[in-house]
């Protein structure tokens, strides 16, 4: 992207079938699962500032100048205030799985390198993902701090060996952006998949129609100025892209 003078960035999720095995590579927060007749097989892991906290903090430990004196690499359960200086609070650093205690110093009052939890977790207060492609020019707003050094483009690859499984006609690979997974869990998606395919067995376009069905489920229905799943739950506000790939007769393509 830098070579073609393009700006911006994206996550990446790719699948390859080769010599009887399925390889799924993921860098970002998209997700892939296999929906089989009697089971669900996760084929990816999401990479967020929260899930990669230790890697990100370790980079800040090795190269403190990347923070430009504006951020602290330490994680705290809450934002610290001036009254906390001199008191012991819980914290985590790159070498810690759990929490420990430290005496708060003035430098600890800076904004955390990784802040928030779940979908609200942010890297440098900017990005919700920690792996992906691009974002070479991205900087923290109103600063010269570059985000790119903390991002990794290296994917995690999961492998599924078809020789170890009896693949059925309705077994599929679901690949989707976080717009789907923000509002539907693996079990809910699998329920939609199995029900839809069972009810549309003779439709030659059923896999494409299933992808549309999943998008519509996550988008919900418009109620006033909002899109809602039901009366009390908001629908996905993110982009929703879904691929449904049948696993049966895979040697034909």
What are these regions (language model features)?
Residues 1-253:
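PP2C/PPM-type serine/threonine phosphatase catalytic core
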